[in-house]
């Protein structure tokens, strides 16, 4: 469902007000006082987060973000705070960032925190958005959409609940029995809750869901509030790993991404690769594309590529802000239609999804020609916040960001076996190189060389790109896609491609594949190849690990290759401590960073950065539940 932003309005006394719901965003006696008295003190904070590794707060309505800012500020002020703070919140009508800035200016004491939040504020697209703040110590996970859907899709273990939103009379859906039972599903064993509402139906609904509630003195002109705790068994937080060490096999975008994400959480990572350095396989191309693939029904591919693109660019911006020499530019991506029928479908997709125009809009042939700097016969999609990334520089930046948390082993062609409670990586002579309780297979097509990965239907797809001489500033000035893609000039070269041949193991550059790439380029930009001064003599061949459904494989590796009887995905036996990060196909840049964040969150017992149905769609064991589909030899 498209996201409709909140409109900025104020009540007569100046309190932020929603015309859609006819209610104020916080108490007219003061939003900050309400946040401290009702939501923080009502949940026993800051005392309850002291001494913990992490503390997870789940909120039903983000609104202005005032409860989040108050929680973040209180956490920063407390010298005995938890190591990490997770704040998870739903919002059906999020504010535009410029409106948030105006609202946050009312609380100058939060100015530095508010500025950081605003600088990281995500695109107003439906789904989950994860923001890393305060040097990664504070994690804000936002679900833009209906809270009934969001709470059902979230995977988290909440220590405290903030029940905030417009009044039950104005917004009954947010105070329904379904909401309360969804909160109970997320509750940790010692979870507490607090809310300003003492309505009878709220008290009774919470009791029926398993919460014990009591009235307490309210804030300002409101005489009473509610606080409570969960009486059910709840979900015990995943215990911290006794030894936070992992083996990561493979140092392409997948392996370096998970290594960086684990190192950011304090893990020690042993990174092993058969090559002499990072990005020597499919991740070694001169330039690749980071952009989504929308669909009319907003299917899983569409949602995952959107989430991966948005999170991927936020990750790139964090690395660049840290001063790392990562080569990437969100110059925009044009995806042109093949024919008039597809052009009409692309227009319909844009109209149906109604995403922010800065993220996706339809452009005519005339506008596409102007944007790209070359005349084209048809229009298509314009992704204004997407662009190109140089994969080797991303891999290098990930390793630099991981610092001493990552120890690399090059020229390490290894075998993997479990010994007692650890996975051991040994070289060809049997010498032990590294061992850890957790092992992650991120070796691209090399994953097929590990017998334990036999349940994973990874196939190799050969891809050849062509490198064309390109003066700086020459057309096209943005990334352009149709049946293939072409990048703008990057260090004097333009990357065009790519072929996609399943089961082809020829590692040599082929003239016929250069011709195929040029044919795709000519079909996209009529007359362009005739203007080339020279035909491509340079290029690169890579072998991409692809899956039958074109979605990556992220999670625990199944311990069997077939099922004797039907069962649920969660019931499939897994190898203890063995995980896969593979099947990225031609979209390694799109998948890698978000997939790594998802797996790292699973390993650390944190709230997940994706909806549950999307996490299941990535589970490596999913292929045991259905017949494998044939992977077509096209991209």
Curated annotation (Swiss-Prot):
Cofactor list: FAD
UniProt key word tRNA processing: yes
Database matches in SUPFAM superfamilies: FAD-linked reductases, C-terminal domain, FAD/NAD(P)-binding domain
Domain of life: Bacteria
Primary localization: cytoplasm
Molecular-function GO terms, alphabetical: flavin adenine dinucleotide binding; oxidoreductase activity, acting on the CH-NH group of donors; tRNA (5-methylaminomethyl-2-thiouridylate)(34)-methyltransferase activity
Localization terms from the record: Cytoplasm
Endpoints of the signal sequence: none
Residues covered by region (tRNA (mnm(5)s(2)U34)-methyltransferase): 1-231
Keyword Transmembrane helix: no
Function text: Catalyzes the last two steps in the biosynthesis of 5-methylaminomethyl-2-thiouridine (mnm(5)s(2)U) at the wobble position (U34) in tRNA. Catalyzes the FAD-dependent demodification of cmnm(5)s(2)U34 to nm(5)s(2)U34, followed by the transfer of a methyl group from S-adenosyl-L-methionine to nm(5)s(2)U34, to form mnm(5)s(2)U34.
Protein name, entry field: tRNA 5-methylaminomethyl-2-thiouridine biosynthesis bifunctional protein MnmC
Phylogenetic lineage: Bacteria, Pseudomonadati, Pseudomonadota, Betaproteobacteria, Rhodocyclales
